[in-house]
Each structure stands twice: as structure tokens, then as C-alpha cells.
Amino acid sequence: MSEKRQFLKEFNTLDYILRSAKNILIVAHSNPDPDAVGSTVALGSFVKKFYKARIVMGCYDPFPDTLSDIIPDVTFENPDELDLTLFDVVIGCDSVERGFDRVIDNVSEDCVTIAIDHHHDITLQSDVRIIDGLYAATCEILYDFFIFTHKQFDKKIATALLVGIIGDTGAFQHANTSAEILTMSADLIKRGASITKIIATLSASQEIETLNLWGRALGRTKFYKENGLAVSAITREDLQGHLVNSGEISNVASMLATVPLVRAALVVYQADDNTIKGSLRAEKHGNIDVSAIAHTLGGGGHKLASGFSIPGQIIGVDDNGWKIV
């Protein structure tokens, strides 16, 4: 079984860069989810506390109001309104291909670019890459970095990290919840993070549009008893007026994978007019390596969580079913 990378060399490099930097921009992906918010705020707060650089936290969308009670007094600056050439370091945290790509196209030539992510399919190039799909959340990677530096971080940083971890593990219900995650979360609670307040806030923050999207996907799910596969589809019509977050799609697959008799779940969605993306999820008891399925379709990932992208369209979504052409 594959093991997570330790990133000792990369952490040394990151620490050196942070100590040398003067102006740092940390970027959360568009339509930021809890892991994007948590990782951006945690790293920004950590640098402010322990390094000398000026910090700006950026995102093409505003800081989510739903998280302002547990992560107060934070503002995201729109990168379009910043002079990006003033930054000597820019860092993308989580789903870096959803916004960070636009930033690094407009920085100065000598700017150092850093990508920190736990998504397996990141192709974006940067000067420093701290990316491993075996981590449950980008906040988990940052926790390891903070521990690596031997700096004693506070309640605010611990809270931001736990927000991301709880968000991407589905409050410890998804298959990516490991013993390491639970030990890490216990440490964050010791540092002052309130697990009950975070879970209550995240549970209450699901938008009606998101719940409706999940409902449509769950309503057209098909179960293939012969192999234990649950399959569903999300169309362009489903997504009209809804800025899709890939995490929302993954959450549908994760929920389906927990249903009794389901060994693995696949949710496909129309990413654009001619591209279909798929999210594969499994639980350990299913004994299915979904990365093998993803690899046959040109994708990747790991045993319990993988994804792929293929050309095509989802058509005929009605009572008679749907198909990909």
C-alpha cells in the first residue's frame, strides 16, 4: 500500500522561502470550501505570527459568510484588484487549478510560485510542488509542515486547520479518515479548536442549491448488484446557475459509497460542453481499488478516491436513464 510523502526536502525549502520573503500572496481557490479557507487562513496566520513577510490572502470570491463565526476577522482580496508584480512569493492552497493558475500567469518573472494540494490530478507547474493525493486535506499537509518547524501555533491556526480537515473528511465519516487524522485532530482540539462548534457550523452552512444538486444526483442513482457499483450523473442543466465545487461532486460519491451493499460509487458530471469528469469513491470494506478504474480512463488517484476526465456528453437524463456519447 502506498504511503504519504513526508516532504522533508520541500518543507525545508518552504521554510527558507518564508524566512526570506517580503511580500507573500496566499490564494484560495474560487468558490472556496472549508479546506481552501482553512488552509489559506492557517498558513497566512502562521506566516504572520512567525515570519516577517507582509501577507495578503486572496481569492476570486469573497470569504464565505458561513465561516465568519468560527474564523472571524478575515478578508479575501480579489487578485484582479492587486498588483501581482509586487509579490515575491505566491502560494496556492487546495485545488490550485481553480484560480491560482490565473494568478501565476501575471506575477513577475522572479516571483517564487508554490502549490500545496492534496488533489491527485494537479498538472499546474510551480517552482515548489507539495502535492500528494494520499493526504485527506491540504490542511493535513500544512499541519505536518507546522510541526516540522517546531513552532507552537495557537488556537486560531488550530481552528482553521480543523475546519479544513473536518470539511474534507465529512466530519470523519469518509474513507479518507485515518488514525493519523484522528490523532492530528485531537492535537488541534488540545490547542483550542472547538470540534463541536466547527461541525455545527459546517453542517448548517450547506446551501439549498447544493442540497438540491445532491438530491437530483441521488435521485437518479443506479445500483449494479452484480458488482456492487452505484453510478449517478449530474448534467449541465443541473449546474446552471450553480458554481460547482468539485468537492460537492465528490461528496455525493462518498455518500453513495457508504450505502450497504455498495462496494464503490461513481458520479459523472458535465464539466463543460465536451468534457465529462468522474469522481470515484470506495470504502475499505468494499475491497475495490477505484484508482484502477480511473487509470483505464486516463485518470488517477488512490485506492479509495480517484477521478478522471474524458471527452463526451451526458444525454437522455429522464425516467428511462442516461448515457454518455
Predicted regions located by residue number:
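Hydrophobic/aromatic beta-strand patches that form the interior of the parallel beta-sheet core
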Residues: 56-58, 91, 112-116, 128-131, ...
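Solvent-exposed alpha-helices and their adjacent loops that cap or buttress functional pockets
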Residues: 82-85, 105-108, 122-123, 153-155, ...
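Short alpha-helices
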Residues: 116-184
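Glycine-rich, phosphate-binding/catalytic loops in enzymes
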Residues: 43-44, 107-110, 131-132, 183
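An acidic intrinsically disordered interaction segment
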Residues: 1-13, 106-111, 133-142
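Hydrophobic helix-and-loop "lid/oligomerization" segment in the mid-to-C-terminal part
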Residues: 2-31, 36-68, 83-87, 167-296, ...
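Active-site cofactor/cluster-binding pocket
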Residues: 69, 74-128
